[in-house]
């Protein structure tokens, strides 16, 4: 069964990008992103994992795309080196700026002729088309590939927006700051016909890439911190999806779903689905409670992997955050209650847990990145005493 057919049978969708009637709110976000795409403004989109970044980008890309404006989407999560990046970048630019597979090989050889590219094209052109390079001149490789969008845009008389998901992955490359400098030096000269939308799921790394004055991408474009969808929109969305499938859920129960998962987009959809699947005609408190148990059970193995390797002090620090402690962790009563050792441990634990993507540190708030993990953690993981 294809994805669209599956969507027709499911009132709620999670774990993948959503579209159409499964996409709710983000109206102001979509307007801002649409204006940036249309007017050639570079965009940096930052938020924790599974808040709907990819869905938003794909929605806006579909809305603004036309014969004069091409949107290229690529995901670099699998890239482990600059060479991986160059291959994926070149491949997707070529694939997504032409509707005719016959042009792909021709364009690769024409626009990348200085690199003598190797083209492979199998029985399935879309999935089997690949570009590779055997050039030893790294500067030439960098310049030729990164300028590919400009060359194509100029030849076709169009504008191109290149959207790169999991952009923080470049921090894992060898000599990452040098690579960032190379990207910035080329991309900042392409403003006439090419712009970029850079986004990723590791908020602390994305923030470090774009918000620190010492980093090459500082002030590269419009830094866009995505917020959670508001409760009112979610309530309406949940009730409509139930109604359209011949079922009913009260505004109060829809509110409980949202509040339980702290308006986390993916979990609102998942918990709503679990409640819906248990509902005969009208959703009840029993359906809601049973769905919560299922949600914890479905994620239990994942949460066990989260805590593997954590020290007793780190686990105890998570307990403090789970109980709503936001600051002043060095107070004697907090250190004593949660067995945090010494005050010198606090900053190290915060940094370590943020790097592991378990917590989100805002100026006045520290929270769990995953609200259901917080519930599971409080329920199943005890405070450890030495």
Kindly label every feature range from the protein language model.
Residues 41-42, 46-51, 55-161, 170, ...:
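P-loop NTPase nucleotide-binding core
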Residues 2-10, 297, 301-386:
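C-terminal leucine-rich, beta-strand-based interaction scaffolds used for sensing/assembly
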Residues 63, 274, 352:
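Alpha-helical DNA-recognition elements
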Residues 132-202, 211:
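Conserved Walker B catalytic segment
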Residues 222-233:
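Conserved AAA+ ATPase "SRH/arginine-finger" region at the nucleotide-binding site
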């Amino acid at each position: 069964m294809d994805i669209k057919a599956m969507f027709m049978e499911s009132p709620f969708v999670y774990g993948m990008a959503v579209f159409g009637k499964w996409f709710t709110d983000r109206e102001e976000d979509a307007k801002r992103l649409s204006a940036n795409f249309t007017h050639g403004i570079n965009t940096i989109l930052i938020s924790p994992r599974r808040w709907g970044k990819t869905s938003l980008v794909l929605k806006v890309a579909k809305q603004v795309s036309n014969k004069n404006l091409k949107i290229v989407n690529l995901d670099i999560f699998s890239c482990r080196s600059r060479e991986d990046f160059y291959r994926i970048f070149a491949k997707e630019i070529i694939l997504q700026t032409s509707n005719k597979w016959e042009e792909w090989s021709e364009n690769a050889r024409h626009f990348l002729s200085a690199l003598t590219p190797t083209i492979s094209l199998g029985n399935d052109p879309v999935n089997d088309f690949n570009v590779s390079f055997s050039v030893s001149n790294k500067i030439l490789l960098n310049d030729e590939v990164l300028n590919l969008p400009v060359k194509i845009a100029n030849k076709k008389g169009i504008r191109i927006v290149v959207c790169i998901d999991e952009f923080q992955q470049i921090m894992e490359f060898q000599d990452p700051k040098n690579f960032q400098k190379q990207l910035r030096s080329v991309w900042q000269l392409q403003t006439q016909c090419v712009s970029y939308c850079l986004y990723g799921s590791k908020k602390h790394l994305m923030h470090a890439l774009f918000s620190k004055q010492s980093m090459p991408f500082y002030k590269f474009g419009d830094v866009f911190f995505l917020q959670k969808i508001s409760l009112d929109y979610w309530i309406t969305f949940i009730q409509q999806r139930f109604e359209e499938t011949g079922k009913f859920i009260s505004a109060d129960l829809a509110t409980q779903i949202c509040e339980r998962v702290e308006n986390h987009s993916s979990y609102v959809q998942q918990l709503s689905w679990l409640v819906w699947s248990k509902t005969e005609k009208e959703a009840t408190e029993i359906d809601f409670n049973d769905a919560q148990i299922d949600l914890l059970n479905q994620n239990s193995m994942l949460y066990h992997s989260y805590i593997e390797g954590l020290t007793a002090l780190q686990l105890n620090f998570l307990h403090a955050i789970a109980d709503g402690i936001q600051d002043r962790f060095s107070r004697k009563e907090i250190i004593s209650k949660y067995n945090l050792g010494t005050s010198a441990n606090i900053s190290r634990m915060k940094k370590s847990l943020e790097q592991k993507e378990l917590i989100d540190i805002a100026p006045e708030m520290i929270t769990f990145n995953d609200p259901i993990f917080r519930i599971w953690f409080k329920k199943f993981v005890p405070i450890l005493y030495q």
